[in-house]
Regions:
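N-terminal lobe/hinge region of extracytoplasmic solute-binding protein
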Residues: 79-129, 240
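Aromatic- and charge-enriched surface segment that lines or borders ligand/interaction sites
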Residues: 125-166, 187, 335
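N-terminal secretory signal peptides
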Residues: 1-15
Length: 607
């Protein structure tokens, strides 16, 4: 049975934190000219109480925080949101749901430390995962903000609704197999055995944010007809939450919440509330942090020159994103449905130059395009093992790229690559507008391709998300290639079998693959869905071997072209706030501003 704690020693966790920081070359803090410490607030677009580390201290001006009770203050923690607060809606299945503020207003079922892949309790205190049945225990002491106690019925309700709605959990649990044992226990029947990491990561995005009184009609509709018309259109201006902060109001420029005294971790929170100021651009958030108008920001890309303008009271917390820029190919396109064309693109792009251009402090190039995250600390190599040397690294080579295009029937005319019918090989690279690092990186990609003779353009788009997920109007586009989780199943499933692969990339459901390490060997047909289903249930050496086989498929077929990985940058000020030191791994949970108060590791200093 998985318990509240994982048994990892604090020294081991500090080593993990140091290894992560060393891998990105960040000291953990950068300096500024001093003020911060206002009571203004603001956010941006997946446990049990952790004990303090051996070198934690309290008192005076120390910024280190323990879980001991602290004096209550009237401070409000200010952070930022890029969403207009008065337009926010608190229906998690609809539009304009404030996913970052929701981390304070609602309680997740569990939390994940992404530096150590450690699962920690939220609403769930314990879990026992068998081959056929999962038993979940609900932590005592949670209440809806309307006053009712949270029970296993509430958790079962949420899980059934999410499964019907197609959440990741629906791949391994049917809604009729969710049952309540008693007020604090529920059981889930599994469709097939799954690895513990696969099951728990499937719970990671789920928060207790659907009070049955508001959503019962939709679960009833699902159970009666298999559909719930109106679920995505339902509006909720005021949430009935379960988190440590309760909604007060949402106005044009701010969302305000107050400390909720009936939360089980309320004794660890010694400040009056949180506020999110509407700051819709990176530049406005940088200015607010520098001027002390906010006390922290959950995640904002910050170039070195901006970070160096900050003072000693602004602390950076690098967060492993397990995510980064890749190229989505539309596999219904006449050119980008061809394996050799995709491979040629991967050869042309200088990934090291790309990472430097995007911001070398927070980006690293993908070393081996195989669908596995972990390029910051080389953890992907642990999964590939001795097979690593067999994979194609796609080191920049215009000669190899040219040979591949020629094999695919392309030729160069007046310096531009054209197909056998004379059609120009174009690369209209669509990216989300306003993403500074991707804009800079995209320019590097386009430059490489144009110099090679592919007609490339960079197209930042305000309608990006609608174009990609709605109209699917794209030829090539930039989007994250990994799934945001270090465990390899999730990124491999995303690339080869999941919704992205099927619905957006239009990647085929079966592929011809040569033996691992023999790219010119005789191919065999591989059906992708059963392969990913098998991987989900494997552990140990069997999981490692299957991971290598599927990573080889990504390496050869490139459903997306993995280019780089990034580190997210989270920020806290320390003039009015006590928080963790850079040695404390407990900050590496999405996101520190919302998780650390639960642990008593982000507290207000006496006024």
């Amino acid at each position: 049975m998985s318990k509240t704690h994982t048994g990892r020693g604090q020294r081991e966790l500090r080593k993990t934190r140091r290894r992560f920081l060393q891998s990105i070359g960040v000291a953990g803090t950068v300096g500024v000219a001093g003020c911060a410490g206002s009571n203004k607030e603001a956010a941006v677009d997946d446990a049990g109480a952790s004990t303090a580390s051996d070198d934690d201290t309290t008192g005076g001006d120390s910024t280190t925080q323990t879980t001991e009770s602290v004096e209550m203050t009237d401070r409000t923690f200010a952070t930022a949101t890029t969403n207009v607060p008065k337009d926010m809606q608190f229906n998690p299945y609809g539009q304009k749901y404030p996913d970052r503020a929701a981390l304070a207003l609602f309680e997740n079922l569990l939390y994940v430390n992404e530096a150590t892949s450690t699962f920690m309790p939220g609403v769930l205190s314990e879990w026992e995962i068998g081959d056929e049945l999962v038993t979940l225990s609900v932590r005592d002491g949670y209440h809806w903000h309307s006053g009712e106690a949270v029970t296993a019925d509430d958790v079962a309700f949420k899980l059934k609704l999410d499964i019907h709605d197609g959440a990741t959990l629906s791949n391994i649990v049917d809604p009729e197999d969710v049952s309540v044992v008693d007020d604090s226990t529920l059981e889930l029947g599994l469709k097939r055995p799954v690895a513990e990491e696969v099951f728990l990561y499937s719970l990671k995005p789920i928060a207790l944010d659907t009070p049955p009184a508001e959503f019962q009609e939709f679960l009833d509709a699902y159970e009666a007809d298999g559909e719930a018309p109106g679920l995505t259109e339902k509006t909720l201006d005021e949430p009935n939450g379960t988190g440590p902060f309760k909604f007060v109001h949402a106005r044009n420029q701010e969302l305000l919440s107050e400390r909720f005294a009936d939360h089980p971790d309320a004794d660890n929170v010694n400040f009056a509330g949180m506020r999110w100021d509407y700051l819709q651009s990176n530049q406005k958030q940088w200015t607010a942090l520098r001027s002390g108008n906010v006390d922290g920001i959950d995640n904002v890309f910050t170039p070195d020159n901006i970070a160096q303008s900050y003072g000693d009271d602004i602390q950076e917390i690098p967060m492993p994103a397990n995510w980064g820029l890749g190229i989505m190919f539309n596999h219904e396109h006449e050119h980008y449905s061809q394996q050799k064309v995709k491979q040629a693109i991967q050869y042309v792009i200088d990934r090291e130059k790309l990472a430097r251009t995007a911001g070398s402090k927070m980006h690293v190039p993908v070393e081996v395009p195989c669908g596995l995250p972990g390029n910051f600390d080389d953890s992907y190599k642990d999964w590939l093992g001795d097979s690593l040397s067999e994979f194609n690294k796609y080191e920049p080579s215009t000669e190899k790229a040219a040979a591949l295009l020629e094999e695919a029937g392309f030729s160069k005319q007046d310096g531009t690559w054209v197909d056998a019918d004379g059609k120009t090989l174009e690369f209209p690279f669509k990216i989300p507008s306003g993403w500074n690092d991707w804009t800079a990186g995209g320019q590097s990609v386009v430059q490489d391709l144009n110099e090679f003779g592919i007609e490339a353009s960079l197209n930042p788009s305000q309608s990006y998300w609608g174009d990609i997920y709605g109209n699917q109007e794209y030829v090539v586009a930039g989007l994250g290639w990994p799934d945001g989780k270090l465990y390899p199943y999730f990124s491999l499933n995303k690339l080869l079998n999941g919704f992205r692969s099927r619905g957006i990339l239009k990647f085929p459901r079966s592929v011809e693959v040569p033996p691992l390490g023999e790219p010119n060997g005789e191919t065999q047909t591989v059906e992708l869905e059963p392969e990913l289903e098998e991987l989900a249930g494997l552990t140990g050496e069997a999981a490692k071997k299957k991971t290598q086989e599927l990573a080889w498929i990504v390496n050869q077929h490139l459903p997306m072209a993995p280019l780089m990985e990034k580190i997210d940058q989270s920020w806290l000020t320390t003039d009015d706030w006590n928080t963790v030191t850079e040695e404390d791994v407990s900050a590496i949970v999405d996101w520190p501003q919302y998780y650390l108060p639960r642990e008593g590791k982000l507290t207000a200093k006496p006024e």
